């Protein structure tokens, strides 16, 4: 049976895992790393680089190297958070026709799910190389606090990458699965504090033994989808840029190349300061002015970094308080605290979490891999490989519709266990009203306009009647992925209208289909590119070995043989310069045949010479006296009873 893989699609890094028997296995990528940078680059010769190779060339190609795209997924261009990001990244973020935030690369506009799909394709390929078979299905994780449009966009990314997304699960829940899978059975309440590259989540999860099943029930979740390691980097970049401006008067924000170098240096310094007290940020030739080149050299202490990011760390505490309140628990009722996400390696974060929860966080969970491992466990549950685990997740935000006076009426409260269904009856606001618009909202505010609009649809042909008489039944249905279906029905006529909520923006079916096609054509191009590279390598290797053999065996070859092989070599060299695969294969065969004949003839010649020499040696041996070279051995008989 084909495997379902688990993918942690992260803001900064991504990771893929699979269940092998009863143990989850994190799969190493082609570079031998267990995590892959979530970076996609477009080169001038139309190659798409993903992961480490994209990261390596980011300094020389800043405007076409896309990182932290997850921060834009499912977001509107006018979102203040997106506007803040525009000023901080070297690539171009623009407004799509549907109002979403897209990116522009080489005069082409691309949707964030398209870029994320490239990362997912790399994860898919990593798993396929390891498993030795095609992978078609995956469980993909998202931040618990992702709204409906962000979940839809993540699902779209999976489809574009050629994956059927069997389930979208929340990152903290996945981490809890990874933690609780092999722990002793019994009831406990854990807090999963997940501070990743771009998002923060806190989930309170109860692990219990119910009828022989290991049950993971999310009691409450909260978070901030625009708070993570990237923000810590940005705070440090701002500080370094302002210090440099003080010294030189030059603003590095206007130079994409300098900004990219600054980002790399900030990330490196932040990581170093998790274990060291001080580091140097040293960037020679960062920029230049009329007076010559300028260098950036700033000493940075851990204390300084902590003062720069203190407010960011503090921002994580309020969601923790809310999650505990929603779960109806106090800090003392939490048995274990688990840290997930690379940013939790920062000592200040660990100290803050310990102070808030009053206990030291667990150190036996790998913050970079736990989420992918949990996704792989959930994948195995769905495929039937793992049988005694039940996962009960929740919807992170309340869902409802806009009613008279611009008020949001909630049908499903936040932290409701999913899947779930809720129905409520509404009526018309005016006499003889023949149509109603159902405006679907997500959020916690009373005022409808202050919440996230998920979409709207009309229910028409309602028989005219006084206001308040018609009965319109609205049903909200959330599936296990946290994705919403809404339907409305006029109880008098039985007329119904329903939609799967696609954010008022989002990608249409046609756009997704076009992107799937585009990704498939790229996959075909990549395959051809790889085949050509392998063929050229094969040709170069054969040319090298033939030239070496001709040099070593110059005296053994006839003039005709030399001429034939030299011609075959030069024709293959010429073919390799071109792009005609069939011609390279043809010339490769000619040289292979010629070199094989040469090797065969020389081997036969050497073999007959060797046999003649051996025959001569044997005849000399037989004339020697028999005693020579013979040694008498003394044997002692061992009786059976002596053996015992």
From Swiss-Prot:
**Where is there biased composition of kind Polar residues?**
609-623
- The coiled-coil regions, if any, are none
**Record-listed Phosphothreonine modification sites:** 199
Q: Known CDD domains for this protein?
A: ASKHA_NBD_HSP70_DnaK-like
Region (Disordered) residue spans:
605-644
Induction details: By stress conditions e.g. heat shock.
For molecular function, the Gene Ontology terms on record are:
ATP binding; ATP-dependent protein folding chaperone; unfolded protein binding
Among SUPFAM superfamilies, the record links this protein to: Actin-like ATPase domain, Heat shock protein 70kD (HSP70), C-terminal subdomain, Heat shock protein 70kD (HSP70), peptide-binding domain
| UniProt KW keywords | ATP-binding, Chaperone, Nucleotide-binding, Phosphoprotein, Stress response
Report the record's disulfide bonds. Answer: none
GTP-binding recorded as keyword: no
**A Pfam family recorded for this sequence:** HSP70
Which InterPro entries does UniProt cross-reference here?
ATPase_NBD, Chaperone_DnaK, Heat_shock_70_CS, HSP70_C_sf, HSP70_peptide-bd_sf, Hsp_70_fam
Indicate yes or no for the key word Transport: no
List compositional bias (Acidic residues) regions by residue number: 629-644
Which NCBIfam families does this chain map to?
Answer: PRK00290.1, PRK05183.1, prok_dnaK
Tell me which family the UniProt entry assigns to this protein: Belongs to the heat shock protein 70 family.
- Chain's role: Acts as a chaperone.
Q: What is this protein called?
A: Chaperone protein DnaK
Species per Swiss-Prot/TrEMBL record? Legionella pneumophila subsp. pneumophila (strain Philadelphia 1 / ATCC 33152 / DSM 7513)
User: What does the organism's lineage look like at the top?
Assistant: Bacteria, Pseudomonadati, Pseudomonadota, Gammaproteobacteria, Legionellales
Q: Which gene encodes it?
A: dnaK
């Amino acid at each position: 049976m084909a495997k379902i893989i688990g993918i942690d699609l992260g803001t900064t890094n991504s990771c893929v895992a699979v269940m092998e028997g009863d143990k989850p296995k994190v799969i190493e990528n082609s570079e031998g790393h267990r995590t892959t940078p979530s970076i996609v680059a477009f080169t001038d010769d139309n190659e798409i680089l993903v992961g480490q190779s994209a990261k390596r060339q980011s300094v020389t190609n800043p405007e076409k190297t896309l990182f932290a795209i997850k921060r834009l997924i499912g977001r509107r261009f006018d979102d203040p958070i997106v506007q803040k990001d525009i000023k901080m990244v070297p690539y171009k973020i623009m407004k799509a026709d549907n109002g979403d935030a897209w990116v522009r690369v080489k005069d082409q506009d691309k949707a964030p799910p398209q870029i994320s799909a490239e990362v997912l394709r790399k994860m898919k390929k990593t798993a396929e190389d390891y498993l030795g078979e095609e992978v078609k299905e995956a469980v993909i994780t998202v931040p618990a606090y992702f709204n409906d449009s962000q979940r839809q966009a993540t699902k779209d990314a999976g489809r574009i990458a050629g994956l059927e997304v069997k389930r979208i699960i929340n990152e903290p829940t996945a981490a809890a699965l990874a933690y609780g899978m092999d722990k002793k059975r019994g009831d406990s309440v854990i807090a999963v504090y997940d501070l990743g590259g771009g998002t923060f989540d806190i989930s309170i999860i109860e692990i219990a033994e119910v009828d022989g099943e290991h049950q993971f029930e999310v009691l409450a979740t909260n978070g901030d989808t625009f708070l993570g390691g990237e923000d810590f980097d940005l705070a440090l970049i701002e500080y370094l840029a302002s210090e440099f401006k003080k010294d030189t008067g030059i603003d590095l924000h206007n130079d994409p190349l300098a900004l990219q170098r600054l980002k790399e240096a900030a990330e490196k310094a932040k990581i170093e300061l998790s274990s060291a007290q001080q580091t140097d940020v040293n960037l020679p030739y960062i920029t230049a002015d009329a007076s010559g080149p300028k260098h950036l050299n700033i000493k940075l202490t851990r204390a300084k970094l902590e003062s720069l990011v203190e407010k960011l760390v503090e921002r994580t505490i309020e969601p923790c308080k809310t999650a505990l309140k929603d779960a109806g628990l106090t800090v003392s009722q939490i048995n274990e605290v688990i840290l997930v996400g690379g940013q939790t390696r920062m000592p200040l974060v660990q100290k803050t979490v310990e102070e808030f929860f009053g206990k030291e966080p667990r150190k036996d969970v790998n913050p970079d891999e736990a989420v992918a491992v949990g996704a792989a466990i959930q994948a195995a549950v769905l495929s039937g490989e793992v049988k005694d685990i039940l996962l009960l997740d929740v919807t992170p935000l309340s869902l409802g519709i806009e009613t008279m006076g611009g008020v949001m009426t909630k049908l499903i409260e936040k932290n409701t266990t999913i899947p779930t269904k809720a129905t409520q009856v509404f009526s018309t606001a005016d006499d003889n009203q023949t149509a109603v618009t159902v405006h679907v909202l997500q959020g916690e505010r009373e005022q409808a306009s202050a919440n996230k609009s998920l979409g709207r649809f009309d229910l028409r042909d309602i028989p005219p009647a006084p206001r308040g008489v018609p009965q319109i039944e609205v049903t909200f249905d959330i599936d296990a992925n946290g994705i919403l279906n809404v339907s409305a029905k006029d109880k008098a006529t039985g007329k119904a209208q329903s939609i799967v909520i696609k954010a008022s923006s989002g990608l249409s079916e046609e756009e997704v289909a076009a992107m799937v096609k585009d990704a498939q054509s790229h996959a075909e191009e990549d395959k051809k590119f790889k085949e050509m590279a392998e063929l050229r390598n094969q040709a170069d290797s054969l040319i090298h070995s033939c030239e070496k053999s001709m040099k070593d065996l110059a005296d053994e070859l006839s003039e005709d043989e030399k001429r034939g092989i030299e011609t075959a070599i030069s024709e293959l060299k010429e073919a390799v310069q071109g792009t005609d695969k069939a011609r390279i294969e043809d010339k490769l065969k000619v040289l292979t045949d010629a070199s094989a004949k040469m090797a065969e003839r020389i081997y036969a010649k050497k073999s007959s010479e060797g046999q003649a020499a051996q025959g001569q040696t044997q005849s000399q041996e037989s004339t020697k006296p028999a005693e020579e070279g013979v040694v008498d051995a003394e044997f002692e008989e061992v009786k059976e009873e002596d053996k015992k």
